[in-house]
Amino acid sequence: MKTVKILDSHTGGEPTRLVLEGFPDLGTGDIESRRKILSEQYDHFRRATMLEPRGNDVLVGALLCKPVNPKASAGVIFFNNTGYLGMCGHGTIGLVASLAHLGKIQVGTHLIETPVGDVEATLHEDHSVSVRNVPAYRYKKAVEVNVEKYGKVTGDIAWGGNWFFLINDHGQRVASDNLDQLTEYAWTVRQALTAQGITGKDGQEIDHIELFASDTEADSKNFVLCPGKAYDRSPCGTGTSAKIACLAADGKLEPGKLWKQASIIGSQFIASYEQAGEYVIPTIRGEAYMSAEATLFMDENDPFAWGIQL
């Protein structure tokens, strides 16, 4: 019998499952090397915690790791039902709020090691969390892709910790009662990008699609389709970072000015950025709430101990 201890939270409605104990020893290398070991040798632990019957396609997992830098508060490896993420904004907010709930950190700024670089996260007195993300940038502007049933679609390719294709002019109604259509549209766009060889820098896969619309309560509302075909309930921290990079590149948002990004369900992040040469350093602020603490059991006699794989 294998057991895994977890602490679940949600950030703006998007769940994070923090793995506290039970995963194999991944060594003492940097976080990226440990992610590689996990994916190549122990991926069944990811599947057990993310896939049904213990997980679902909305969950993002966060494996708590001992950091390399003694000044860091934590290291983290993010993953979901389909694989691994470089960075996760809502997940980092969930991580910090969870560590505070456990009494492991106090109010203040904390260094967090991720597979794509270090980020700073500040736990505020009101329990909200600000994440100073990895450098973000727009890779290409106004990229055209021919999409089956929809014709020519134009969007920007940007990095915010993951690769995004950001679409402003899409002709879709961005509303919570239109999720099936939004999912179908965004998934078709993603398939077209792959089929036509449109990628991020160095051929990296664009695995997030982000649609934007106006909003009465925020500067913008988005719909974000994640790699596993589930939509993001939060405004998406890395997606908001990619959006900020595009706004900065177009001269539509000045450094330090606040941008309020709403999600498809109405939750919000507050974002701003600092200019750093050709990059921007986004800061995303949001709140996370604890939802469950549990121990997962993987019984060797259970045919679905390591998840249902369809």
Swiss-Prot record:
<feature type="binding site">
    <location>
        <position position="232"/>
    </location>
    <ligand>
        <name>substrate</name>
    </ligand>
</feature>
<protein>
    <recommendedName>
        <fullName>4-hydroxyproline 2-epimerase</fullName>
        <ecNumber>5.1.1.8</ecNumber>
    </recommendedName>
</protein>
<keyword id="KW-0413">Isomerase</keyword>
<comment type="function">
    <text>Catalyzes the epimerization of trans-4-hydroxy-L-proline (t4LHyp) to cis-4-hydroxy-D-proline (c4DHyp). Is likely involved in a degradation pathway that converts t4LHyp to alpha-ketoglutarate. Displays no proline racemase activity.</text>
</comment>
<feature type="active site" description="Proton acceptor">
    <location>
        <position position="88"/>
    </location>
</feature>
<dbReference type="GO" id="GO:0047580">
    <property type="term" value="F:4-hydroxyproline epimerase activity"/>
</dbReference>
<feature type="binding site">
    <location>
        <begin position="89"/>
        <end position="90"/>
    </location>
    <ligand>
        <name>substrate</name>
    </ligand>
</feature>
<feature type="binding site">
    <location>
        <position position="208"/>
    </location>
    <ligand>
        <name>substrate</name>
    </ligand>
</feature>
<dbReference type="Pfam" id="PF05544">
    <property type="entry name" value="Pro_racemase"/>
</dbReference>
<dbReference type="InterPro" id="IPR008794">
    <property type="entry name" value="Pro_racemase_fam"/>
</dbReference>
<comment type="similarity">
    <text>Belongs to the proline racemase family.</text>
</comment>
<feature type="binding site">
    <location>
        <begin position="237"/>
        <end position="238"/>
    </location>
    <ligand>
        <name>substrate</name>
    </ligand>
</feature>
<feature type="active site" description="Proton donor">
    <location>
        <position position="236"/>
    </location>
</feature>
